Amino acid sequence: VIGLGCERFNPQELYDAVKATGKPVAKFVIQEEGGVTKTVERAVTVGRQFAAELDRQERVPCALRELMVATKCGGTDATSGLAANPAVGSMVDKVVAEGGSAILSELNELLGTEKYLAKRAVSPEVAEKIYDAIYEIEDVLRGGLDFSLPENRNQLISPGNFAGGVSSVVEKALGGVHKSGTAPFQDVLQYAMPPENGKRGLFLMDYESQDGEVVTGMIGCGSQVVAFTTGRGHATGHPLAPVIKITGNYKTYAAMTECFDFDASDIISKGASVEEVGEKLLELVIRVA
């Protein structure tokens, strides 16, 4: 933990919170260490010590029920909702069926799907949480705009989405929801807050779509691996968990092969089943995790 020394957020608070978990942590305050150079030197020394300790850890087998997968999309095109997202959804269903967990978020890109999501809630209480979360995001985004007008609805998607063949925010939302598969939603999680009482299954995290921030939040909820879909090409990553990059666009995969880990385009180009591709994706997720 590195801080300047006079921020509104005291680095000591973050240090104390991490230490309470039992994880190794160190704190450096630039104004107390004698400047940036000395801070970096001391932090690098401690970081190397932490790395040496981590190198002694060994990977051990664990049950699939211990896995939590974060799902995210970015750089969406028409193939995302047809191939990549359904493949992720199939993988999510398999993880949840084995007692594992998964998270869907990006609520500002799910506007209009709230009834569908609420129908999959495990209880009326969870359904109400889903409605509340999405309606709150919609109120924030509205900002005086009338979303009954097409030109305003289209404010919620990028020029790249249009160029990739996505016709509207409705199509984007209906495609994005496929990442969650078909399992029931167990609860709505707050940002970076793990499920209570060790609950497992499919969850919705209450947060809007900012790639780095939303992924960080889902990792904070307990996700050990991220399934990230993109049709246009999005070379994203994260320092805290592996990000598996998935595309359903064979042209994008061919043009940016080094950026991708999984090609789901066989669903479109070769008629492969979503179930078949989802199984292959699950195998990759298990290897990575």
Segments from the language model and where they lie:
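Metallocofactor- and cofactor-centric catalytic cores in central/energy metabolism, strongly enriched
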Residues: V1-V225, T229-A289
